[in-house]
Amino acid sequence: MTIKSDKWIRRMAREQGMIEPFVERQVRTEGSERLISYGVSSYGYDVRCADEFKVFTNIHSATVDPKNFDERSFVDVKGAVCIIPPNSFALARTVEYFRIPRNVLTICLGKSTYARCGIIVNVTPLEPEWEGHVTLEFSNTTTLPAKIYANEGVAQMLFLESDEPCEVSYKDRGGKYQGQTGVTLPKT
């Protein structure tokens, strides 16, 4: 597998609609305001977080069960900033909608700006032929409330191209998160 460059990412976004909306350069400021960067980087794409969040609360449940998840465990928040309570987490989604090619696996890594503040971003790989908004998981590992900024960079996508297409893609197997929009909760 080879990692794909900024040139390839731009071409795939333009010709195949791989990333929409797409920002062709790295954005670090808006007017005089400094931002957490987003857009194309040398070997990846820095995604933005939309302004829709689900913040975890333990009011309705004593146990977190991925097979029987209680939607009431989240409080919906919409805004330019989301505050995650200490030692808690929140879900969000990318501004960008992705369409992953059949011969590509996409890996997501958190941005150092957040990691150095104790905020961890987790996303499972975007599999071949998966498409949708990416659900982002933010963990606040600190003992203080933590801020997440909407419409700014939160994670970087790395695109790995295989030397041959897979036999069965995510789309072929009817993956449960195919075509997801908005913040998507766990499914079994």
From Swiss-Prot:
The active site is at residue 137. DCTP binds at residues 111-116, 135-137, 156, 170, 180. It comes from the Bacteria. Its EC number is 3.5.4.13. Pathway: Pyrimidine metabolism; dUMP biosynthesis; dUMP from dCTP (dUTP route): step 1/2. Belongs to the dCTP deaminase family. This is dCTP deaminase. The lineage of its organism: Bacteria, Pseudomonadati, Pseudomonadota, Gammaproteobacteria, Pseudomonadales.
